[in-house]
């Protein structure tokens, strides 16, 4: 922990005042209070690590292992069961669906055939447990924003063959930038006074909740952590098997960058360790180089495989000092700061940590309604086991780029504007602006733009086939 000796007198006083104020916040546990003060102390001591650009090396295939070089899997179902008995699946479930106009946890947005993200996750694990006679548990890490709703939602899975456990990530007070006081002490006692400190918090929260010890007692060895909105983040035994054989304590799945991913974090070799390099850590003069697909060819999918005993060892030693991400916000006109950490940045603290360079199919996030259009279309199919699989009929390995105007931003509006989702198997790009409505059975091919003039409602008729066209009015269809 940052002590007064590493701080200027002014910062030491700031931290002491903050300690006194936080001590009186009864909404949070002692673990949360000390975790928060620890984080702020590190932030004030300015321990942010500066990257020496000349020391960055491209990781070798030993460090970032190509997927096809992973150890081969046994075909024996008994061996598969042995592997699965060591596994826990953890989904990061702290996010709300607000950016897509939904209330409640993002994981309950319907993805396809009336099934939500959470329904699909449960189906997948149910199928594994049934097929191999194993018992892979599902853990959901909620935030205080999603906890109550999630408890109600998981009741519907009471009859499934899965143990579902929920726990909360930490709840920290937002800091008022002006005087470094906790926002809840300023009379803002509602949810706006607090924040969840990023998914780097998964490790201490797993420990503090008691879940980590309970899992270790059941003989579990590895946790597969992924965002609940990544439809490609399914259990992969090849990765798990490789980690167990090679005693790798941590594995980050990376995949080749496309132009859409230039801001994503990448893995580098730095002073003999593999570590995550995020755009925020890159000196200004090197940002364009960081974004180049030539030099930094891979990016972090946030699918992580981590050894449970190693998490316990490092959390107990207070060794997981990930880079702090300062996230400035404004609440009711008051400038506040929230300090966060990312789970991927923990890679450098684990022994024999590696990356696995996986196929792009393992990264299928739904961040906006444009992504929802992709996964609800004929570009993908849904299997009985809950897997969203790309349609082999599409010859182009990359997905079409889709830009929808603000009229489509909310899920309800998006669904209302499509009588049915168009066929996009041969689409390269789609850009839609203005008050546009799609009929049923529409087919889009090549490069298509649809732009309704201001104040004009533009309807694409049922059954229309539009190939390589710019449509600005009914006469263009």
Swiss-Prot record:
InterPro entries: Nucleotide-diphossugar_trans, UDPGP_fam, UDPGP_trans. Substrate binds at residues 94-95, 199, 227-229. Its EC number is 2.7.7.9. Its cofactor is Mg(2+). It is found in: Cytoplasm. One of its GO terms (cellular component) is cytoplasm. UTP binds at residues 92-95, 106, 169, 198, 229, 367. Monomer. Plays a central role as a glucosyl donor in cellular metabolic pathways. This is UTP--glucose-1-phosphate uridylyltransferase. It comes from Solanum tuberosum. The lineage of its organism: Eukaryota, Viridiplantae, Streptophyta, Embryophyta, Tracheophyta.
């Amino acid at each position: 922990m940052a002590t007064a000796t590493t701080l200027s007198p002014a910062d030491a006083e700031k931290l002491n005042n903050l300690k006194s104020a936080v001590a009186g916040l009864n909404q949070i546990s002692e673990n949360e209070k000390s975790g928060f003060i620890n984080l702020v102390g590190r932030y004030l001591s300015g321990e942010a690590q500066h990257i020496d650009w000349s020391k960055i090396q491209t990781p070798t295939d030993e460090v970032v292992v190509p997927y096809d070089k992973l150890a081969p899997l046994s075909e024996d179902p008994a061996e598969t069961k042995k592997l699965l008995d060591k596994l826990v699946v953890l989904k990061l479930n702290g996010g709300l669906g607000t950016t897509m106009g939904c209330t409640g946890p993002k994981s309950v947005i319907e993805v396809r055939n009336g099934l939500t993200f959470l329904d699909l996750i449960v189906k997948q694990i149910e199928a594994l447990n049934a097929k191999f006679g194993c018992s892979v548990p599902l853990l959901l890490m909620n935030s205080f924003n999603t906890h109550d709703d999630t408890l109600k939602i998981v009741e519907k899975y009471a009859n499934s063959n899965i143990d579902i456990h929920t726990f909360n990530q930490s709840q920290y007070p937002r800091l008022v930038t002006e005087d470094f006081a906790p926002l809840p002490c300023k009379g803002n006692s509602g949810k706006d006074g607090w924040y969840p400190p990023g998914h780097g918090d998964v490790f201490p929260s797993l420990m503090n909740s008691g879940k980590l010890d309970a899992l270790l007692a059941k003989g579990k060895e590895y946790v597969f952590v992924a965002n609940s909105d990544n439809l490609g983040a399914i259990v992969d035994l090849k990765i798990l098997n490789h980690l167990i054989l090679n005693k790798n304590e941590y594995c980050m799945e990376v995949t080749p960058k496309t132009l859409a991913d230039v801001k994503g974090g990448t893995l580098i070799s730095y002073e003999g360790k593999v570590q995550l390099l995020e755009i925020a850590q890159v000196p200004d003069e090197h940002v364009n180089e960081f974004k180049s697909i030539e030099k930094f060819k891979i990016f972090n999918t946030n699918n992580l495989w981590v050894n449970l005993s190693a998490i316990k060892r490092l959390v107990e030693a207070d060794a997981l000092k990930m880079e702090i991400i300062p996230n400035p916000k404004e609440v009711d006109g008051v400038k506040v700061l929230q300090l966060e950490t990312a789970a991927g940045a923990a890679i450098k603290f684990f022994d024999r940590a590696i990356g696995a360079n996986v196929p792009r199919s393992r990264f299928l996030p739904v961040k906006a309604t444009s992504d929802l259009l992709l996964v609800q279309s004929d570009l993908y199919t849904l299997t009985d086991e809950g897997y969203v699989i790309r349609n082999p009929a599409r010859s182009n390995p990359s997905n079409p780029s889709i830009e929808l105007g603000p009229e489509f931003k909310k899920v309800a509006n998006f669904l209302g504007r499509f009588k049915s989702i168009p066929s996009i198997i041969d689409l390269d790009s789609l850009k839609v602006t203005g008050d546009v409505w799609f009929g049923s059975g529409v087919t889009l091919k090549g490069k298509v733009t649809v732009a309704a003039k201001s104040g004009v409602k533009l309807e694409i008729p049922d059954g229309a086939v539009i190939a390589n066209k710019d449509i600005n009015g009914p006469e263009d269809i």
